[in-house]
Amino acid sequence: LKEEITTEDLSFGIIPKLNVSSRLEHANTSLQLLLSSTKSQSVQIAKYLAKLNKQRQLITENALIEAKRQVVVNKEKGENNILFTGKPDWQPGILGLIAGQLSEEHYRPSISVSGRGEILRASARSISEFNMIKALNSCGDIFEQFGGHAMAAGFTIKRDNLKNFRDIISSIANETLGNVPEGPELIIDAEISPNWLNQETMSFLASLEPYGNGNPMPVFITKKVHVVSAKKVGRNGNHLKLTISHNENIYDAIAFRQGNRIKETKNELEIAYTAKFNSWNGKKSIQLTIEDFKVYE
């Protein structure tokens, strides 16, 4: 058991396991865990949810392979400002995960659809420059049901109306996002040397939690970073694990969803990153999470 539970532990460890039952089965299982009054029952349900979450991860990964292929095909057809993906047998509970990851990777609003009958279900995820619920409201009569907010929404729609909706929302996206680059603006808080990150400063950064919407983690930049080693990690080699050095100090770093950029790490780099304590076998070390990097010039 970890000594401290962080917001990151909640966001990426605990909450997905609580959500998974509603995605694949029924939310009642997670409710039973929260209401459980005995340790044995809690452990039993928690193990089941952890197993179900691994199943969800595999289902989502397989669906994403197909979704990414569809994005490439659609972009070749000129559909650049909104991402449409879908397959009849995708489980409704993973549609938001598919749309969210594609939106994050391409920095464009994304809509994922599934269903075999007359009525289809869809989830939408967006970016700050595109108000999704406002866009859906502009053609609200076309849906059976819809709802959400600026960054995320969902709807049901008749199959016969899907093409018309796709044309309308694509037109809105082209109007709105024509000059928006395919990547979010990364706000840098300070240029530092990583050796500034010690017990005292990390404790100060921890005191600023919880991080999240409206209070993002501080992002630092360091120039002239030497890459000691770099390798792809993750089930599909999607991520980069690096050992880097700066001013003769060595640091561990991870760059999520940037495995395809491994060739760039053969050069000295300028990196933008966040920092956190990583606990392993009772020992704490500082790990850098690289948000972006470029070759140092």
Where are these regions (language model features)?
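Hydrophobic helix-and-loop "lid/oligomerization" segment in the mid-to-C-terminal part
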Residues: 1-162, 185
